[in-house]
């Protein structure tokens, strides 16, 4: 058996742990409640929550007056929240506080007449939700998209910009993106909104991957931060495997391996 180096940062991050606990408490208090979509990006945890009386609504229209719904850790569209509350649906906001901060930064930028720029995955629920807190956010998935936008119109360089990041964005990708904007544009405010847990997890994963023969990353395939951990590990280790559970591991993967590394995404429980 190879020696195994386990990442100390593995396990639920604060925001995910908080959302799961809030959902469980709400279900106990109400005798059953709803989550709108997946509360977190972990199929096994979502299935466990369903067994505890937390049903999944596929659409806001599935909820009626008097229902209680727990808002997922990634946040929700502002228009959806306004609609639910307007129809008498009780919303328990389990949005990660770090995501709430980004929502407020974007809303404040709107009030100040500034253009919001989000560095992250355009279709990720967190990014889509954050973008809804202003009229029109620019979403860039990296420095190449930033360069393309700048090349479209010379006047873009004169627009007052407020730049934020998806909480699970890769640190180097965010930095390389805002550095271009800071260099090329005349009025830029930059907020590093990558959460500390994400930064710590990414740094530790890179350190471990550089010391091992093989690296295993555990997390749901829908999880952005798990995908990013895998990408980071691949830069330091040639043999990296992303799995959702131990059943996906094959003994053959560890052939010739003396030291193996193990880390996990923020939506993966430690136990």
Which residues does each predicted region cover?
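The feature marks the mature, well-folded catalytic cores of soluble enzymes
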Residues: 1-271
